């Protein structure tokens, strides 16, 4: 077998392994202390976002709810996968626990960790999110990835969307973050 065929085979197997691992992790249950730790990390990630983008404090106060993923891990070598756990806040208090997963393929390489926040700006957007068996961005969901200006202000056109997504705190080497194709599902281990 030639070296290029071995490399291609390794890339395919690595991609499948990443995707399978993310899928298996999505089904893991969590104990009460682990949930408490997740809430603490989500509160800290929310504070980081408020510090980095001060306008998000008002956005959180005016939104029907918001979902914070304090740590989303993404890795890829041709095939990619990402996974994280998050907390839904309503009225500033934890109201549910969620997983985020994603898979992709193409010319990509790297690994990174980042935080992600989803603001549901209308009661209808939050109700739709809560009533579905999983939100998949890019599948008919009207959302905007926030464009934040140098002043920390959020663009007016972004504020008019029912779901606003922020990606922040990136660490690692990876060529960009793609939120389309991510799937968010409620955890059943509350």
Model regions: which residues?
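Small-residue-enriched, tightly packed secondary-structure blocks
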Residues: 29-190
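N-terminal secretory signal peptides
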Residues: 1-26
């Amino acid at each position: 077998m030639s070296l290029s065929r071995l490399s291609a085979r390794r890339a395919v197997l690595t991609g499948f392994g990443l995707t399978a691992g993310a899928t298996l992790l999505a089904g893991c249950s969590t104990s009460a202390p682990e949930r408490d730790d997740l809430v603490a990390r989500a509160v800290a990630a929310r504070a980081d976002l408020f510090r980095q983008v001060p306008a998000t404090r008002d956005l959180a106060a005016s939104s029907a709810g918001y979902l914070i993923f304090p740590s989303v891990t993404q890795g890829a070598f041709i095939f990619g996968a990402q996974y994280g756990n998050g907390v839904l806040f309503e009225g500033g208090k934890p109201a549910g626990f969620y997983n985020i997963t994603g898979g992709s393929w193409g010319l990509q390489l790297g690994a990174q960790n980042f935080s992600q926040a989803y603001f549901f700006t209308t009661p209808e957007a939050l109700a739709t999110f809560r009533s579905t068996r999983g939100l998949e961005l890019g599948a008919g969901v009207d959302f905007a990835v926030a464009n934040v200006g140098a002043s920390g202000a959020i663009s007016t056109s972004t504020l008019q969307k029912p779901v606003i997504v922020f990606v922040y705190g990136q660490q690692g080497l990876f060529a960009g973050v793609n939120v389309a194709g991510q799937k968010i599902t409620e955890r059943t281990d509350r």
